[in-house]
């Protein structure tokens, strides 16, 4: 059943406990990074995330900073990851805990009421195909992070493969893939043929500081990155990028300009981070 929706964007995703380069636990998951993209929104915007109540204290600073923009729902567990950056383009990642699943009950609890949704799965099981179909039936335009296609739901060193359900694709309006995810999905070079086979109207393939390819209606356009930021760890850059893209699309901005604005936001936010070694790419 279609719901009465307002122009705007809602981000849905699991909270995550991150351990980056052996440092103490830090807030992770899209909810921890996307809010900076939504704070100056001219359209309705909010984030709904899930995590175990025992872990909510780690995310209190986010609630204090962003207030009503962020809402946290209780779940039986919290996603957890370890990330070790090797250099600006490479990192090792492992899964310490698989997070909760967003089903019908969780969608009803979140009750998104905006035309656009940014779904931010950390692993393949976060948003099942039935959930995506339910959201599409409500009338939402879904922007989906490709992590949910390639990341297997198992504890240990992160396993990525292309064994995802094809039923995940039809409900999507936009699919965002990092370069390495695109290679996995395509089983080789990602090109117009791959984009046509997937059947998603808009596909973004990001290349970090090298920019972003936009696949729409059988064509591809490369949008350069705003500027390069070296010497920082870039966890969450993809979350900020996709949230900003979805926000601007919900406001009527076209794909190319939305990518430009998202790239500018990410570069500006990365410049605020302390320089350190080793560094990596999100």
Residue spans of the language-model regions?
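Conserved beta-alpha-beta core of the PfkB/ribokinase-like small-molecule kinase fold
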Residues: 116, 120-193, 211
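Conserved alpha-helical elements of sugar-nucleotide-dependent glycosyltransferases
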Residues: 26-30
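Active-site metal-binding loops of divalent metal-dependent hydrolases
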Residues: 13-15, 240
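Alpha-helix C-terminal capping segments
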Residues: 35-44, 248-251
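Short beta-strand scaffold segments in enzyme catalytic cores
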Residues: 36, 81-83, 211-215
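Generic beta-sheet signal
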Residues: 48-50, 145, 206
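Conserved phosphate-binding/catalytic region of the ribokinase-like
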Residues: 2-5, 159, 163-166, 189-282
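Conserved N-terminal subdomain of the carbohydrate kinase-like
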Residues: 2-8, 16-25, 40-121, 125, ...
């Amino acid at each position: 059943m279609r719901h009465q929706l307002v122009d705007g964007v809602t981000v849905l995703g699991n909270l995550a406990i991150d351990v980056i380069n052996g440092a103490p636990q830090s807030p992770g998951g899209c909810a921890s990074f996307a809010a900076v993209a939504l704070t100056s929104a001219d359209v309705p915007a909010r984030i709904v995330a899930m995590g175990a109540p025992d872990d909510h204290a780690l995310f209190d600073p986010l609630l204090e900073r962003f207030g009503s923009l962020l809402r946290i729902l209780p779940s039986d567990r919290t996603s957890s990851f370890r990330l070790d950056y090797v250099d600006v383009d490479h990192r090792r990642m492992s899964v310490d805990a698989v997070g909760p699943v967003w089903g019908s009950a969780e969608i009803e609890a979140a009750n998104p009421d905006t035309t656009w949704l940014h779904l931010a799965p950390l692993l393949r099981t976060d948003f099942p195909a039935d959930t995506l179909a339910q959201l599409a039936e409500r009338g939402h335009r879904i922007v989906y992070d490709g992590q949910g296609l390639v990341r297997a739901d198992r504890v240990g060193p992160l396993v990525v493969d292309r064994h995802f359900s094809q039923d995940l694709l039809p409900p999507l309006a936009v699919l965002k893939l990092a370069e390495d995810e695109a290679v996995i999905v395509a089983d080789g070079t990602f090109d117009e043929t791959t984009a046509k086979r997937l059947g998603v109207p808009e596909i973004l393939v990001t290349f970090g500081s090298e920019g972003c390819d936009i696949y729409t209606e059988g064509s591809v356009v490369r949008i350069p990155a705003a500027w390069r930021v070296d010497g920082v760890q870039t966890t969450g850059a993809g979350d900020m990028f996709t949230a900003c893209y979805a926000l601007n699309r919900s406001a009527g901005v076209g794909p190319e300009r939305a990518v430009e604005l998202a790239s500018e936001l990410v570069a500006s936010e990365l410049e605020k981070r302390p320089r350190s070694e080793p560094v990596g790419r999100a």
